[in-house]
Amino acid sequence: MAVDGFELAYDRVGSGPAVVLLHGWPGDRTDYRDLVPLLSGCEVVVPDLRGFGHSDKHAADPVAQYSGPAQARSVADLITSLGISRAVVVGYDIGSRIAQALARSRPDLVSALVISPPVPGVGTRVFGPGPLREFWYQAFHRLPLSEELIDGNPDAVRAYLRHFWEHWSGPQFTLSAEHLDHLVSVYSPPGAFTASVQWYRAGAGTTSAAASETAPAPEDRLATRAVVLWPEHDPLFPREWSDRIDAFFSRARLRFVDGIGHYVPLEYPSVIADEVRGFLADDPA
């Protein structure tokens, strides 16, 4: 069933308590291929988000159709259409933002969150000299020039994606040639790269959005159980930015994860599996 005209491609593996895995940019649902086998005894659902992988890609208004709430609508519909009543939802990068949006809009569907940055609380620190050197790509993605230079050009796609996979990962991680080839294959068809950056054109998770976030009243904080896995070597999100989680989440726990970078599901999948199983042990429904 399509939501707003978008159908999501997804993998569904196993049976048991439900776990939904939401990927980041510049990835797709294969970001979780090392985590899924660690979740035996669970029903694991891994979609490609709107505009990614093998899911629908429409030249629609970005704000209306590619924002966090819009992406969350598709994930919520997928969960309910599969007959799942509640799930532990995992997300990193934009998948983290979408998981949080889902927990806010449909708390009945989300039993717990296992997420890594971004999370709210950064504020105007995002405009410091260091962050500005890292977040240039978000402004670039909003320019027509980005699609003119990259969209539909496999060599340009390969060089561009490789930069982020190398720069954002920890010192012990190297993306396999096979995985990079796969990502190039799904980001290279005409329109695919442009669809993937509609998230940024919607203003979702951008530096300006981070700077404008204000803490809610204590009673309005996100009440879903959550753990925030904060990597040691993520150049986008230094650990000192973890100091305001309690201002936005009422039941969140912070866990620093040493030795890894931005791509937690690929660099340290077992830490996610451990947290998922911990939540399920407390509340297996």
Residue positions per predicted region:
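Short amphipathic alpha-helix adjacent to the substrate-entry channel of hydrolases
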Residues: 30-44
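Alpha/beta-hydrolase active-site loop signature
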Residues: 26, 50-53, 120, 261-264
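Flexible "cap/lid" subdomain of the alpha/beta-hydrolase fold that forms the substrate-access gate
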Residues: 6-8, 18, 30, 45, ...
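Conserved acidic functional residues
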Residues: 24, 93, 266-267
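Active-site glycine-rich loops that stabilize anionic/oxyanionic intermediates
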Residues: 16, 24-27
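Catalytic active-site module of serine/aspartate enzymes centered on a nucleophile-bearing elbow/loop
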Residues: 251-285
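Structural cue for short, hydrophobic secondary-structure segments
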Residues: 21-24, 46
